[in-house]
Amino acid sequence: MPHNSIRSGHGGLNQLGGAFVNGRPLPEVVRQRIVDLAHQGVRPCDISRQLRVSHGCVSKILGRYYETGSIRPGVIGGSKPKVATPKVVEKIGDYKRQNPTMFAWEIRDRLLAEGVCDNDTVPSVSSINRIIRTKVQQPFNLPMDSCVATKSLSPGHTLIPSSAVTPPESPQSDSLGSTYSINGLLGIAQPGNDNKRKMDDSDQDSCRLSIDSQSSSSGPRKHLRTDTFSQHHLEALECPFERQHYPEAYASPSHTKGEQGLYPLPLLNSALDDGKATLTSSNTPLGRNLSTHQTYPVVADPHSPFAIKQETPELSSSSSTPSSLSSSAFLDLQQVGSGGPAGASVPPFNAFPHAASVYGQFTGQALLSGREMVGPTLPGYPPHIPTSGQGSYASSAIAGMVAGSEYSGNAYSHTPYSSYSEAWRFPNSSLLSSPYYYSSTSRPSAPPTSATAFDHL
């Protein structure tokens, strides 16, 4: 390799075994060989291995070649030679005017083909785009004499001098007043003819100054005068915001007083009293609609103290109580007298009738004043179950709970069922004689173990 024979200066071997000289660029022959292999379609990694040049060096050389078309090394720390010479810029402008849709890389190839530039001095694609953007397509507000491409405009395009431009007509020059002016939008009276003429003159002067400033780069640059709002204009603009958009939400004080007069406080109190009267009366039963439902009147004074006393059950009570309970109790609620006659007070009443047994776990229930205490039975029992069956689960109570007459052998007397036989209702007649079927008749003898276990379920 030619670059391996370089021995001048500080050199060495790279990671691929190729010789290099520190601080010196790669030889011209190696650079050209890299470009040739790239044109042949060899990958940069293969070029790096074949020429024993680092991959970064190959990529940098190829990238610079694709960008500028030159394989010469750049000057480190120095400035590049100017490639956008006036001759090159003029040629680029000519190409672009002849074919406005021409791409930058086509312009670059044409510059090389016509010999305007060589591979070292040809501008890059990005440079050509920058030249087209900044020098060929001049902005409209640049001076006429400083434009490079002024002399070579297309025949169909002409530039109009600024002196021939008619200033825009002021919206207030109309004698009747423009609807789109500030005064027209705000509904303010138009000023006099003299004032309008002065305003028109000042607007036209400001427009002319702004346009003339574009044709002279030395003069001071003045912008169009912005419309300033007077105090009268500001007050007219603030008026819509001072009005209430929602009068119902923010009513005036007089409106509020009128509303209060329509609904005085005594009228509201009487309406509340009428509403209370329409509520459920004391005689209306609460809870479930039971056949043997009993109600009690509400105590007149809910704050009166109550005394809870225990009474022993009557001797004639036939209720069966479990043997585990030592004694049963009945609750009587009696209003404590306040010193008045006995007839004036509410007569004592029983919360539960004497026929119902009350266990110890029910003696601690809270008493709710103002509500009715209903039902002759304990909670959880249907109304048709006699009270004697609510005390325990003895066999006699279970026999009383299910009446055997309801399941007798007689046919139904009801018309829809009179045509059906006994076999239709009870296809298996052995169910009626089963020891587990409860009837009013005596139960047939069954094994004591099974009967006892069933009774205690």
From Swiss-Prot:
Q: In which tissues is it expressed?
A: Expressed in the developing excretory system and the thyroid gland.
Cite the residue spans of the region called RED subdomain: 87-135
Q: What is this protein called?
A: Paired box protein Pax-8
Predominantly, its location class is: nucleus
Which organism was this protein described from?
Mus musculus
The record ties this protein, via PROSITE patterns, to: PAIRED_1, PAIRED_2
Q: Where is the composition biased (Polar residues)?
A: 159-182
Looking at the UniProt entry, the stretches that span the membrane are none
Q: Which gene encodes it?
A: Pax8
Job of this protein? Thought to encode a transcription factor. It may have a role in kidney cell differentiation. May play a regulatory role in mammalian development.
The record's listing under Pfam families reads:
PAX, Pax2_C
Q: Which GO terms describe its molecular function?
A: DNA binding; DNA-binding transcription activator activity, RNA polymerase II-specific; DNA-binding transcription factor activity; RNA polymerase II cis-regulatory region sequence-specific DNA binding; transcription cis-regulatory region binding
Q: Which residues form the signal peptide?
A: none
Modified positions (Phosphoserine) in chain numbering: S304
**Region feature PAI subdomain, mapped onto this chain:** 12-68
UniProt-listed SMART domains: PAX
One Gene Ontology cellular component term attached to this UniProt record is: transcription regulator complex
Query: InterPro entries under this entry?
Result: Homeodomain-like_sf (IPR009057), PAIRED_DNA-bd_dom (IPR043182), Paired_dom (IPR001523), Pax2_C (IPR022130), PAX_fam (IPR043565), WH-like_DNA-bd_sf (IPR036388)
Quote the DNA-binding region ranges, renumbered to this chain: 9-135
Alphabetical keyword list: Developmental protein, Differentiation, DNA-binding, Nucleus, Paired box, Phosphoprotein, Transcription, Transcription regulation
Q: Which terms under GO biological process does the entry name? A: animal organ morphogenesis; branching involved in ureteric bud morphogenesis; cellular response to gonadotropin stimulus; central nervous system development; DNA-templated transcription; epithelial cell differentiation; inner ear morphogenesis; kidney epithelium development
Quaternary structure, per UniProt, is:
Interacts with WWTR1.
Keyword Methyltransferase part of the UniProt annotation: no
Segments carrying the region annotation (Disordered) are 159-224
Subcellular localization(s) per the UniProt record: Nucleus
